[in-house]
Amino acid sequence: MQSIVLILILQLVYVPFLTLRTIFLVKNITFLAAIFGMLEMLVYVFGLSLVFSGKQSMLAMVVYAVGFGLGIFLGAKIERKLAIGYVYTTINTQNKNEELVRFLRNEGFAVTIYVGEGRDSNRYKYEILTKRNRETELFQIVEQFEPNAFIISYEPKSFKGGFLLARMKAKQK
């Protein structure tokens, strides 16, 4: 029974390591990806050896698979909590909301505003690049000022220059 519990625990460690390694690799954080890759393989080999050692029990194999599924869930929760990287958010409104813009800027968000031609009238587009860990906060602020706003958010692969980069360099000094 101890080995069954150990297999489950190892899967709950292995799969989040796999998730983090993949995220760091995609985000081009190679050193951490390599560290997590090494740890991932150590846990993987040890866990698999427990499943296939001695008498191969069906229960051990099922627990291994269940642990993998639970590990995916746990890894996703960890990833959301860490919120590594940046999001580029576009907000579209029917009216120019100076109060929203002022509030966002006071909260440290860099906002660029464009006027676009909609079907029936002009539309206002606000572009914001921010850290992923502030995405929920940004959405809540926009919802408070513009409940009918259309919002799109996605992760940029790379960027260069701009307000955010200058501010990050200033904080490092």
UniProtKB/Swiss-Prot annotation:
CDD domains found in the cross-reference section: YitT_C_like_1
One family name in Pfam for this protein: DUF2179
Keywords attached to this entry: Cell membrane, Membrane, Transmembrane, Transmembrane helix
This protein's name: UPF0316 protein Bsph_0745
Principal location: membrane
Location in or out of the cell: Cell membrane
Keyword Ribonucleoprotein: no
Protein's membrane topology: Multi-pass membrane protein
Organism whose genome encodes this protein: Lysinibacillus sphaericus (strain C3-41)
Transmembrane segments: 4-24, 31-51, 58-78
